[in-house]
Amino acid sequence: MARIGFYGRLAERFGREIGIDLPDDATVATVRAQLGGLDPATIRALVNDATASEQTSVGPGDRVDFLPPLSGG
């Protein structure tokens, strides 16, 4: 099971953290598809605290964080 963390408006939608089961060949794109509505053009992904691409592998025990655009000053 992978842990998925959400911040900002995403935490309001999904909660701060959930666990999901993934196939053996899962990637960040797989996680986005399973959750739905996480546009890669605007929502940044981190895997185990490192910036991730859509092709980054995600396995059991990994943590994926999704961060919406930040604003303010």
State each model region's role.
Residues M1-G72:
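Ubiquitin-like/PB1-type beta-grasp interaction modules and other compact soluble beta-rich domains
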